[in-house]
Design a protein with these regions (language model features):
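The serine-hydrolase catalytic nucleophile loop
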Residues: 55-66
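Conserved alpha/beta-hydrolase "acid-adjacent" motif
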Residues: 260-265
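Conserved alpha/beta-hydrolase
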Residues: 69-87
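Conserved acidic catalytic loop of the alpha/beta-hydrolase fold
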Residues: 98-115
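Conserved hydrolase catalytic core segment
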Residues: 113-157
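Catalytic histidine-centered segment of alpha/beta-hydrolase-like enzymes
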Residues: 283-295
Length: 307
């Protein structure tokens, strides 16, 4: 395992050294006066990375191997409002409509007529809403281990977590009790697995990967305000999969065969008219633990639509 992690680090450092030659960072102020951190890496056709969480930041993808794609396209990283290195909203506005409006204001400020999207995890919900509201701005999209239905994802994590807990009778009694709110049981499952030191199994193949990710996400300059606020907006817990049938841009869906955080069959809920699906061996962090395989699966798609 240690050897595999060292190989991942070595490959990521090589890509980082390449990308540093073509990197610029800036802050873009939205129409409601929120300063968003934006970073461009590489050259070529612009590709917006929409991070997950909910309410995480783009730092994990960049530092855990995602920057490999900057060899072929220009990755546009940004931290969503109230996330990472971006400011919080003074108006306390974290509504879905406002968040996706941020995406398009970034596009306009950077001067792109169109761009592609790579969305990860919870970013799938945001990407779907963005494509639904601003269809003319998107050339193509990559959905990387994305959810379009948070309740479905919560249920998937609970069921797999019970397997990891050996289907203990008392655990099943609590976690399958529908009188307890689903989101509470979801959070409690993560807490229970964390106490047992096996929470990594929902997201990663290796415990070392989770430890490294935790070390990045706990850096003091990263904020998590959006992660706290979005739970007050019921709209985020809708089922977004019906909207996929109305989104006509080319879509590549990547799903990890061991992505128990999202659900290994979640991709079957997606019905984009122009969709290609690729299943890759691995968990939720394919960009980190299976970087080479992910790069080889996604890059031909990016190149195809980069004209």
């Amino acid at each position: 395992m240690c050897k595999n992690i060292l190989l991942i680090f070595s490959f990521a450092l090589t890509i980082s050294a390449f990308a540093q030659e073509n990197v610029d960072s800036l802050y873009i102020t939205t129409s409601d006066s929120v300063k968003l951190f934006v970073k461009r890496s590489g050259t070529g056709y612009p590709v917006l990375f929409i991070h997950g969480g909910p309410g995480s930041n783009s730092y994990y993808f960049e530092k855990e191997g995602g920057d490999v794609f900057s060899k072929d396209v220009q990755l546009v990283y940004f931290d969503q409002r109230g996330c990472g290195r971006s400011d919080s909203s003074s108006l306390n506005d974290y509504s879905l409509t406002r968040v996706v409006k941020d995406f398009d204001e970034i596009r306009q400020k950077l001067g792109y007529k169109q761009w592609m999207i790579i969305a990860h995890s919870f970013g799938g919900i945001l990407a779907t809403q963005y494509a639904y509201e601003y269809p003319a701005t998107i050339k193509a999209m990559v959905y990387l281990n994305c959810t379009l239905n948070l309740p479905y994802t919560a249920q998937s994590a609970i069921m797999k977590g019970l397997e990891f807990l050996s289907n203990n009778k008392e655990d099943r009694k609590y976690f399958l009790n529908d009188s307890i709110p689903l989101l509470k049981r979801w959070g409690d499952m993560f807490d229970t697995l964390r106490k047992e030191r096996i929470v990594y199994k929902l997201m990663f193949d290796q415990a070392q990967s989770k430890a490294y990710d935790d070390s990045l996400m706990s850096l003091p300059f990263l904020k998590y305000v959006y992660a706290q606020k979005l739970w007050n907006y019921s709209e985020y817990f809708d089922d977004f999969s019906p909207k996929t049938s109305q989104i006509n841009v080319p879509v590549l869906v990547i799903s990890g065969t061991r992505d128990y955080t999202i659900g290994v069959d979640h991709y079957k809920l997606m019905h984009f008219p122009n969709m290609e699906v690729k299943l890759l061996e691995g968990a939720h962090a394919l960009y980190f633990e299976h970087n080479k395989e992910l790069y080889e699966a996604v890059t031909p798609f990016l190149r195809k639509y980069s004209d």
